[in-house]
Amino acid sequence: YYVDLQNR
């Protein structure tokens, strides 16, 4: 899952 850089 890739949604870490967009949230932080």
Swiss-Prot record:
How and how many cofactors are bound, per the record note? Binds 2 calcium ions per subunit.
The entry's keywords: Calcium, Cell wall, Heme, Hydrogen peroxide, Iron, Metal-binding, Oxidoreductase, Peroxidase, Secreted
Does the UniProt entry include the keyword Hydrolase?
no
Its main localization is secreted
Gene Ontology cellular component terms for the protein in this record: extracellular region
* Enzyme Commission number(s) from the entry: 1.11.1.7
Cofactor entry? Ca(2+); heme b
Query: Where is this protein found?
Result: Secreted; Secreted, Cell wall
Q: Name one GO biological process term.
A: hydrogen peroxide catabolic process
What is catalyzed by this enzyme?
A: 2 a phenolic donor + H2O2 = 2 a phenolic radical donor + 2 H2O
A single GO molecular-function term is: lactoperoxidase activity
Family recorded in the similarity comment: Belongs to the peroxidase family. Classical plant (class III) peroxidase subfamily.
Instruction: Outline what the protein does.
Output: Removal of H(2)O(2), oxidation of toxic reductants, biosynthesis and degradation of lignin, suberization, auxin catabolism, response to environmental stresses such as wounding, pathogen attack and oxidative stress. These functions might be dependent on each isozyme/isoform in each plant tissue.
Q: What is this protein called in UniProt?
A: Peroxidase 4
